[in-house]
C-alpha cells in the first residue's frame, strides 16, 4: 500500500533537500514553496492544530489538486508516492474525510481513514516526511505519477 501527496513540480527541489514538510515548518524555516492549499484551508488547519501535519491521500487523485491548478495556486502537479510505514508513526493522525471539513473525525486510529468510503480521507503525518519514505516521479512531468511501471496521466487541459 502506498499513500500519496500532490505538489507543484517547482517544489521538488526543496523536497529532495529537506523532505516533505508541513506548511508550518516551511514558513518557520523560510523555505520558499508553492502551496496547493489556500489561505482558508491553512487557517482551518491552524485552528484544528493541524498546521504542522503533512496531508496524504489514499489514492493518487484528489479534487483539491485540480482546484489548485484551476485557481492558479499551482501551475501543475505531480504525485509523490509515500511509503505506508508513516502510518505506524506514533504522532500520525487519520481523518475519515478532508481534515478541514467540519464533520471530519480525526484520531489516531488508522481505520478511521483506511476504512473510510470518502475519497478525501487523509493520513496526517506530523512535521515532515523523511526522504527514505518518498518516491519521486521518474520524470518531472505535470500530473504524471510513475508507479509500478504504469503511468497515470492527469490531463491539465481538463482543469
State the predicted function of each range.
Residues 1-159:
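Active-site-proximal loop/hinge segments that shape catalytic or ion-binding/gating pockets
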Amino acid at each position: 500500500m502506498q499513500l500519496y501527496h500532490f505538489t507543484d513540480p517547482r517544489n521538488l527541489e526543496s523536497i529532495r533537500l529537506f523532505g516533505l514538510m508541513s506548511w508550518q515548518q516551511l514558513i518557520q524555516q523560510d523555505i520558499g514553496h508553492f502551496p496547493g492549499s489556500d489561505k482558508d484551508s491553512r487557517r482551518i488547519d491552524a485552528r484544528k492544530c493541524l498546521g504542522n501535519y503533512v496531508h496524504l491521500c489514499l489514492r493518487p487523485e484528489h479534487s483539491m489538486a485540480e482546484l489548485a491548478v484551476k485557481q492558479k495556486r499551482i501551475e501543475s502537479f505531480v504525485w509523490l508516492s509515500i511509503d505506508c510505514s508513516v502510518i505506524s508513526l506514533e504522532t500520525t493522525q487519520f481523518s475519515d474525510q478532508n481534515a478541514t471539513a467540519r464533520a471530519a473525525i480525526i484520531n489516531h486510529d488508522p481505520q478511521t481513514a483506511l476504512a473510510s468510503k470518502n475519497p478525501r480521507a487523509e493520513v496526517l503525518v506530523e512535521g515532515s516526511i523523511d526522504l527514505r519514505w518518498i518516491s519521486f516521479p521518474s520524470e518531472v512531468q505535470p500530473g504524471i505519477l510513475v508507479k509500478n511501471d504504469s503511468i497515470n496521466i492527469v490531463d491539465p487541459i481538463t482543469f
